[in-house]
Amino acid sequence: MLSLKSRGSWNVLRWIQVPRRTAVIPAKPSPMRRKRRRIKNVSSKDLDLRGIDPQDSRALEFKVKQLQEFTRNLKEQFKLADSNTKKLEAEEELAKSIPEDDDKRADELFGKLEAPAFEKPLPQPNLSTLILSAENQQLKKLIPVEIKERINDDGFLLARLIDKDNQNWNDIISKLYTTEKRLSDISMPIISSGILRKVKNLSYENIEKLDIMLLETKNGDITCFNRLMYETLLLNLSNLRPPTSGEEDKVTMKMRQLLERYDKSKEISPDVPSKMTQFSLNCCLKYSTKSVSFENMEYFLSKFKNDYGITPNRENYTTVIQFYVKFGVSKQAWDVFDTMKFLSSSHAPDVTTYNSVLHLCNRERDYAKAIDLYEEMLDRQLQPSIQTLNIMAKTMARASADNVISEGKADSLRLLGWKYIHTLESTFDHTKHETHFYHTLEAMMALAAYDGDVGFARALYYKYTTRKYKEVVKYWKGKFDSQKIWQTALDPQLFNLLLLAYANFRPNKLPILLGYEKGIKLRRNILNSVDYAGRYDLDDEIKVQLPMLPISDMNQAWQILAESRALWQFNLEFGGYYDLRDTPEGFDTTRLQEMVSKSATQDELQFNILHQVSQWKFQLVNHSILNPKSLTTFLTIPIKNGDRIEFMLRLKEFTFQQNDLESRIEKLYKGLKLVESRVEPNSHERDLAINQIEMDENVKWFASMKHKIVAKNYIYELMMKAASAFKDSAISKDAWQSRGEYRKTKLFQQMDSKRRIESDTQFAALMVQFFARQNMLTDALAIVMSTRKFIDWKYHMVKGLHEGLVKLEDEKSISILLDIVNKKSSIELLDEKIRDFQL
């Protein structure tokens, strides 16, 4: 959680401690320091105490030292005497056993007796020997000796295994595969403990090599392929990334191949115990979830249940639910969840399972269901996790956005969301759970954004972004790359929530947090902990500043518009690294003419231009920020704050019409091709001069596409909302005509028919709403009547029109409208006839 202390004692979530350093400075040598006296050559006469004053401590101390020195000398003399005695005894014994005339042999013996006094010490191992010995001991723990001998490269093995968190088994398996014997003649216990239980993160190619080597150990007998072998291969397969669209899914094919191998082994030896386990099933389900393959999920579930008698356990069921949630199949997810609750206690949902279905509630904005599940967890004595509380807070925030879904209780839902945040704050220590910090921050920003609490949302965004930037810079390695650093620090999800807070800002609305004591304290501490001017960061080595107004809170619409525009540019430009208005380097009229000349057809020219624009977007614009979701929120800000001019400027600068692109390319292509075909030189020069202005304009227009998004249905719907808000018929007319042109393009025609009908329905409803607000009731009713065969009109879509007709007491029009709204489908009419017939 965020720290709630005041500015003076506030600390960031991650502590950066600088240890104190001490220095020891030796004292300056003093000329007055008395030198220590060394006592030498002490005799027995020196030990005489006569003439010594008993009160003189220095004299007595000196005599004690003389006595110690005399005693030490005596000990050395005794040792020397003992040594000489031993030498004499050895000499006499040698003289008795060896002839006296063998002087040479005697000298050698006496030399050996003398040798111990001058013998050199035993040779000590050098540093290289110690390192090699340590490496051998370490390798014995990391890999079996038999496999080490096969590879025969200790340095290679140690370099790839010494870091237990990042072991490189791919290189080891590849090198082992190139050896002569591979895994042959190595006992199964050694292979199991040294390879199968340790190998991880293998590539697909190395999984195939490992499979071949394991089969070789069994001489190709698939009946001897044991359980651990299957589990190891399936586990490494499940950790691989699914292929991109259009590529062959080799991983799923390999998984199915392993199951088919096991089926064949069962046919050969039906009495062998089952080698398929819950673990194997979970590996298959894990990969199916990542690949988002409904077909594979159903195949593995039915295969393990029908052929192997393995029904999913709690972990398997949770994986299946997570898959259904990710796939968007809510009904199946709820069915599996309900099934788990009615099975044995070992299958009962745990906190992870509840979190999975809570994600579904958040997506569907079903706050009532989420609250019921949370209370159910408490009744079953399951401790909600940090993730649980974060999801609950987000669900309350999202549900409060729609007045219909929230049933008019938007403020109550946000207040309940803050309750979950306070529970999280009091229950968990954020320093021990910092990995969940981002999700908690996201939940808090969501609550503030939907409440329109700009001050709190921008403070959280500033704190997170500046902290993230400093962390990235601090641990950055290699050449400093400002673009990549800012791309990492600028989070698109949090930025969209900040834009949403700007859009929902109302100067006369009191934030929810200011309605109770805990909220007041939290909001005050967060706002006071932020210094937008950077005055308190002067001593910080890493400087960072965001283009935000140096005020803690906002109360004017112009402040919202100015800051949102500045932050939008800042995010798109990688923190100001590029300028959006600059033309990309190397792109001018000559380059554009060259592209036209090299294009054989108009479609080829369009493809080449769009390809160039996509490269610019990737290189020069922060494309993670420039997306339809953020753009919609960005365009909504001036609508909610009542600034028509700003809305039109933003719309023109960051969107383009598909038909404008096609018509411009067509004119450019035909115009230049026509000029190239001219024969008369004077006419040719005149046409080039005339087209130079158009070419310059085309260069600017195509260059600006790098920071623009093509206008689709959501843009036209937003234009209609703006027309209603500003009561501007010109905007509505422009939206109507532009969308009409858009419906003729391939982009719209290639859409699914269901989506086309949905978009037409939504746009028509907005048109009716606009005309009703403008009191153009006849035009609104005409739209409803002309589209009744294609659009299923509901009352909430024509509510404004109906209320306007009621005020005018136009009974005929009201009757026509209600007949259209209350009309029944052919299926409903058929059901009524069947019921009448039964009666």
From Swiss-Prot:
InterPro entries registered for this protein in UniProt: Pentatricopeptide_rpt, TPR-like_helical_dom_sf
Described purpose of this protein according to its UniProt entry: Regulates mitochondrial small subunit maturation by controlling 15S rRNA 5'-end processing. Localizes to the 5' precursor of the 15S rRNA in a position that is subsequently occupied by mS47 in the mature yeast mtSSU. Uses structure and sequence-specific RNA recognition, binding to a single-stranded region of the precursor and specifically recognizing bases -6 to -1. The exchange of Ccm1 for mS47 is coupled to the irreversible removal of precursor rRNA that is accompanied by conformational changes of the mitoribosomal proteins uS5m and mS26.
Keywords of the record: Mitochondrion, mRNA processing, mRNA splicing, Repeat, Transit peptide
Miscellaneous comment in the UniProt entry for this protein: Involved in mitochondrial-nuclear incompatibility, a major determinant in reproductive isolation between species, through hybrid incompatibility of Ccm1 and its interacting partner 15S rRNA between yeast species.
Repeat region (PPR), residues: 313-347, 350-384
TM helices/strands, residue ranges: none
Biological-process GO terms, alphabetical: mRNA processing; RNA splicing
Protein name: Mitochondrial 15S rRNA processing factor CCM1
Record family assignment: Belongs to the CCM1 family.
Family annotation (PANTHER family): OS03G0856100 PROTEIN, PENTATRICOPEPTIDE REPEAT-CONTAINING PROTEIN
Major localization listed first in the record, in broad terms: mitochondrion
Subcellular localization(s) per the UniProt record: Mitochondrion
Transit peptide: 1-59
